[in-house]
Amino acid sequence: MGQNDKAARRQKIKLRSKTRGQGTAASPRLCVFRSVSQIYAQLVDDVNGATLLAVSSMAKENKELKGTKTEVSHTIGKQIGEKALAQGITKVIFDRNGFRYHGRVKALAEGAREAGLVF
């Protein structure tokens, strides 16, 4: 499978999943983006078109995180879960953004669940 095939497959899955679940203020969408070296997670309210919360491995407080990319992703998941609970958000819709539920995406989801988010 070539690089263009993978990108096209991801875009197709991304569009298909966006029509299924829209986030609200009470139950926002936990959107995950994974690059080659970094991972990003944000809580999105699709009704109002607003990002409620964002955490990434690029943030200043996360620059010193050590370990593998999967371990860092798990930590990012815990952080977004703790920050969401501090804002009173307990239930989210998980949007893997076309990425397979494996590796870093799975680690982020498990970290968020450990912190107390329900999805």
Swiss-Prot record:
Gene Ontology terms: biological process: translation
Lineage: superkingdom: Bacteria
Function field: This is one of the proteins that bind and probably mediate the attachment of the 5S RNA into the large ribosomal subunit, where it forms part of the central protuberance.
Short name of any one Pfam family annotated for the protein: Ribosomal_L18p
A GO MF label: 5S rRNA binding
PANTHER family linked to this entry: 39S RIBOSOMAL PROTEIN L18, MITOCHONDRIAL, LARGE RIBOSOMAL SUBUNIT PROTEIN UL18M
Protein name according to UniProt: Large ribosomal subunit protein uL18
Family to which this protein belongs: Belongs to the universal ribosomal protein uL18 family.
Chain residue ranges for the region called Disordered: 1-26
Keyword tRNA processing: no
Assembly information from the UniProt record: Part of the 50S ribosomal subunit; part of the 5S rRNA/L5/L18/L25 subcomplex. Contacts the 5S and 23S rRNAs.
Biased composition (Basic residues): 9-19
Keywords from the UniProt entry: Ribonucleoprotein, Ribosomal protein, RNA-binding, rRNA-binding
One cellular-component annotation, GO: cytosolic large ribosomal subunit
Xref: HAMAP family: Ribosomal_uL18_B (MF_01337_B)
Species assigned in the record: Prosthecochloris aestuarii (strain DSM 271 / SK 413)
